[in-house]
Amino acid sequence: MLGVLVLGALALAGLGFPAPAEPQPGGSQCVEHDCFALYPGPATFLNASQICDGLRGHLMTVRSSVAADVISLLLNGDGGVGRRRLWIGLQLPPGCGDPKRLGPLRGFQWVTGDNNTSYSRWARLDLNGAPLCGPLCVAVSAAEATVPSEPIWEEQQCEVKADGFLCEFHFPATCRPLAVEPGAAAAAVSITYGTPFAARGADFQALPVGSSAAVAPLGLQLMCTAPPGAVQGHWAREAPGAWDCSVENGGCEHACNAIPGAPRCQCPAGAALQADGRSCTASATQSCNDLCEHFCVPNPDQPGSYSCMCETGYRLAADQHRCEDVDDCILEPSPCPQRCVNTQGGFECHCYPNYDLVDGECVEPVDPCFRANCEYQCQPLNQTSYLCVCAEGFAPIPHEPHRCQMFCNQTACPADCDPNTQASCECPEGYILDDGFICTDIDECENGGFCSGVCHNLPGTFECICGPDSALARHIGTDCDSGKVDGGDSGSGEPPPSPTPGSTLTPPAVGLVHSGLLIGISIASLCLVVALLALLCHLRKKQGAARAKMEYKCAAPSKEVVLQHVRTERTPQRL
């Protein structure tokens, strides 16, 4: 078939007919060093593959979601072709196989000879176990896609003519679109680009090496070129010297002097123009870094030449020397989960209201009381901390703030009683329960013996102010006995530590009798008295029983005499 086409073209050329026109793409997109183009028109898989090969490319491979997005862009701007089917570079060799055992491509291969992919979008998800037999080819279409932005893949007979095809081209380097200085003159400038794969237009994100640019009305014809091994190309022309300074800085490596009708490139001090009239040669005494805004990398293969580089978050400006900020927030996908704020050389991520930024992700705030172990109730303070609160009449325990204890700051408070029986009641420390289920403050000062100084009764406790004659003069605590305050270690030979005047901390009461202890002592004493009385009663009963037994034994002989059998004599009857 290919031989017939070649012979036909030669025959037409020999007869003087013009050669077939080069196919014009209906749309194209370039991503870094790869370009993709849509060519409308009926063609079999073989015809489409030959045309792409003739343009130094191949039918498109769709190995990732990025390539699928490119197809969506091309289909949206193709004027209706997207509603039909387009060949891509995926085919099934002759033979049959089980698609379930052949990976995501079901045994199909790319025209590049491999089956590497991280993406697939088959129209028929389940083949019901039916084997696939080649040869088959794949076309994409958005007509029956459930998601318009994700065209589906359909198996087709390779001899069937599709409505068009997609080609893919790879280039070692690309150029950015021409930079035009803003102003009144810029509005009149019109640029038309042409690519090696016959795409023409004014809206390109990147142009591969070999692309041309026609600048009207200046009459400029520029070409995207790059030295061997370079990945970033630049715009140039065969004629030496600068062109209009408003377009790409006149092509000058350093500065462009906009002399009317005769623009000229200038180099920094110590450097000279090269033969092309646009490049500069650095002097041996000049530092390379003086020529670039951020970093300068000398080219060891070409003495005097260099390349400028920028820090992360910046890119080279059109003059290839200055650095301009990259707006990271316009990238797709966005670097932030919700809101992105661009900064000089970077960006900041922010979250919507009621969300928190945690490890680069926006998450709903977690209730700080979720894992709290509060005995009664938890009160959030902020997004990370909380406070345990207690019921009325209770307060947190200082050393265990998640637990509660009874609290009373008056001379009398209601007791905490069992609501079922009312037989079990508790009072705070320093209070005693009366008959009316009321906790009454124990007046330690009235009882005496607790303070040798001036005693002030307080709710639940007391305060002892030591007199001037005391070893702890002016000390405020619960005792003025230095031995008790010092813990009883009066014979250690060490002087007692000086108390802090005016201390508000109440030390542990040494010798203070707790109300519960008083009740316990009373109950124990009563039990002891009852036990003694019981013991006396038992001894008296035992002594009485022994005496009765002895009396019984002593009286036994007389009782036996009395109880012996009495013999009676028979008395004769008188007549």
Curated annotation (Swiss-Prot):
Principal subcellular localisation of the protein: membrane
Disulfide bonds: 137-158, 245-256, 252-265, 267-280, 288-296, 292-308, 310-323, 329-340, 336-349, 351-362, 369-378, 374-388, 390-404, 408-413, 417-425, 427-439, 445-455, 451-464, 466-480
Family matches, as InterPro entries: C-type_lectin-like, C-type_lectin-like/link_sf, cEGF, CTDL_fold, EGF-like_Ca-bd_dom, EGF-like_dom, EGF-type_Asp/Asn_hydroxyl_site, EGF_Ca-bd_CS
Every EGF-like domain range: 241-281, 284-324, 325-363, 365-405, 404-440, 441-481
One Pfam family cited in the UniProt record for this chain: EGF_CA
Domain writeup: Extracellular region (481-515) contains a binding side for alpha-L/beta-2 and alpha-M/beta-2 integrin.
Protein name: Thrombomodulin
